[in-house]
């Protein structure tokens, strides 16, 4: 941890909101899921929690990139680019449509490093989701800040698909709707001019949490099992310009290993799922 940001360690925020039938339906259709969306009293899928507990600030408190300005909850890190590097989840009790959810944010670690791409600052945030006094889920979120510009990476040998595989694609409308439902104003996901001309990406960036959500639904569908734990790590960005693949394999009786491969079969996201024992 860097002493410059000591006062932000342990900083907390709390949000209260109800899981509405309307938002459950909107996310269901945004993700193009099969079947009917959940109605009042029915369980939502585990990573629905990514739509909960996001900060809401007036437009004049947003930075150029669309995130809330730094210096309040997040420390005033001067590095220009922010990325969702990964997260770990543990699910204790299903969230349901109609639940009144309390989401607590807590900054648990701040680390500064110097890598091949320059200075990096990593922030770990613990989020806890309670319904009344019951802890329903936890998320350990990893955010990284950097000044480095996106680089054209050398291609590695193509990754081989696992036992399960599905080809997918997305588009600006779907990315915009997911941004809206998660109240994520980061412009790299819906503002093509900003993404390409300011941040230097070739296209719109597919949200890391959206890719993780697709993987979590994919493994639940393929295995027929309920999730106990899920973790993912972003390795390289995926863009709206090309298709990508979800792939995975069982790993023992109660786990699976998962990946997102881009259109060139390069590793974009890794993930692991642990199932509720049968």
Regions found by a protein language model. Name each.
Residues 61-71, 89, 140-141, 171-182, ...:
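Phosphate-binding glycine-rich loops and adjacent basic patches that engage nucleotide phosphates
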Residues 1-100:
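Hydrophobic, proline/glycine-rich low-complexity stretches
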């Amino acid at each position: 941890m860097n002493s410059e940001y000591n006062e932000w360690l342990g900083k907390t925020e709390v949000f209260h909101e109800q899981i509405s039938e309307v938002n459950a339906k909107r996310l269901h259709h945004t993700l193009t899921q099969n079947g009917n969306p959940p109605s009042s009293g029915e369980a939502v899928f585990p990573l629905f929690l990514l739509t909960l507990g996001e900060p809401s600030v007036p437009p004049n408190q947003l930075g150029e990139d669309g995130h809330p300005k730094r210096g309040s909850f997040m420390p005033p890190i001067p590095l220009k680019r922010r990325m969702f590097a990964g997260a770990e989840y543990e699910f204790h009790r299903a969230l349901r449509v109609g639940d009144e959810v309390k989401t607590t944010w807590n900054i648990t670690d701040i680390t500064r490093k110097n890598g091949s791409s320059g200075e990096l600052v990593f922030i770990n945030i613990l989020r806890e989701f309670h319904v009344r006094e019951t802890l329903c889920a936890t998320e350990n979120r990893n955010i990284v800040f950097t000044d480095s510009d996106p680089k054209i990476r050398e291609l590695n040998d193509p990754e081989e698909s696992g036992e399960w595989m599905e080809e997918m694609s997305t588009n600006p409308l779907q990315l915009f709707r997911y941004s809206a439902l998660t109240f994520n104003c980061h412009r790299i996901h819906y503002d093509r001019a900003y993404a390409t001309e300011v941040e230097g990406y070739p296209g719109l960036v597919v949200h890391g949490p959206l890719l993780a959500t697709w993987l979590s639904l994919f493994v639940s569908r393929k295995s027929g099992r309920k999730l106990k734990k899920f973790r993912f790590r972003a390795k390289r960005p995926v863009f709206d310009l090309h298709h990508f693949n979800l792939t995975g394999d069982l790993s023992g009786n109660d786990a699976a290993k998962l990946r997102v491969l881009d259109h060139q079969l390069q590793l974009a996201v890794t993930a692991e799922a642990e199932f509720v024992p049968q």
